[in-house]
Structures are given as C-alpha cells and as structure tokens.
Amino acid sequence: MSKDKALDIVLSEFIELAKVPRPSHHEERVSKYLFEWAERHGLAVERDSLNDIIIDKPASPGCENVPRVIFQAHMDMVCVSEEGVDYDPVNDPIKVINDGVTLTADGTSLGADDGIGVAMCLYLLQDDTLRHGPIRAIFTTNEEDGMDSLNLDPRYLDGGVILKSEQSFHLSFSSAFS
C-alpha cells in the first residue's frame, strides 16, 4: 500500500473517531465504537471491566512463529473549548477542519492525543498488505487523569514487543517479559 493511501486511511479513521465523544471517565461510547469496529473487520475483540478494548489480528501465513507485537493507545482525550463555544464534551462530537494540510478543530481541542494513535492502530489492524506476526492493539481508558488501565490484566501483555508512542519521533519499546 502506498504511503498516501495509508495516510488517507489513518486520517479517515481519525475523523470518524472524532465523531465519538470521549472525555476521560466517559469512554463507554468510544469503547463500544472500537468493539464494533473490530467485529466489522472480523477480528477477535475483548472488553474488560474498565472498558479497555483488546483487539487481536492473527499472523500472516508463514509468520505464525514471530513474536506478537502489541500496540497501545488511549481512547480518552482532554476536552477544552474556546470561550463562548457551546460544547458539551460528553455528548458533542469534535468538528474537524481539514484544509488539506492541517487538521484542526472548530473551537475545541482536537483529540489527537491519542486519537491519532488509535487511528494508526486501526490502520495496522486492517491493512492486509503487510506481512506480520500476531498483532494486538490495546485501547485503554482514562489515561488523561487517572491511568486506571495500569490495572490491565497482565495476560493481555504477552507480546514479544510492546509499542507505544505519545510524541512524534519518540517511541517506547518494552516487553512484558524479559
């Protein structure tokens, strides 16, 4: 798949995600959205008691013995608005403005932290042109002010490599097992 096509898919997934309100402590709808997304794509999916979503994609043929790679992104966002903007973060979607170069929001925060991480994971889960070992995407809740998902069941962390990125050009590598 070309870089342009991949970028189009990531941006499309992000813009769709922005339609789902997702402030911290109110992730039920976005959790449901991601669960249903996985089902539509024929992927194994689980939801835990905190509404964290765990999606598994099997390995490409011939790559079954490659260690699982786990990608993690949080689904909640900081919700702020400019003074005078009528915005209810629990119920209102983000109005994304795409000028062809930059994505911004109409008077509110955009939710790129970590909505773009979620969108990138969704792209990886749906791209069937990549050869890969087993992939797991973990979408966690309440990262912005509580880090509730630190209590994630350790059985979900059985990967050879865990990839998480919060900043451009900075990638965290870790493993549940040394």
Language-model regions, residue ranges each:
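Metal-dependent catalytic neighborhoods of phosphoester/phosphodiester hydrolases
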Residues: 28, 147-148
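Short, intrinsically disordered, charge-balanced linker/junction segments flanking boundaries
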Residues: 93-99, 163, 172-178
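Short acidic loop-to-helix transition motifs that present clustered carboxylates
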Residues: 50-54, 144-146, 170
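A glycine-rich helix N-cap at a beta->alpha junction
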Residues: 152-175
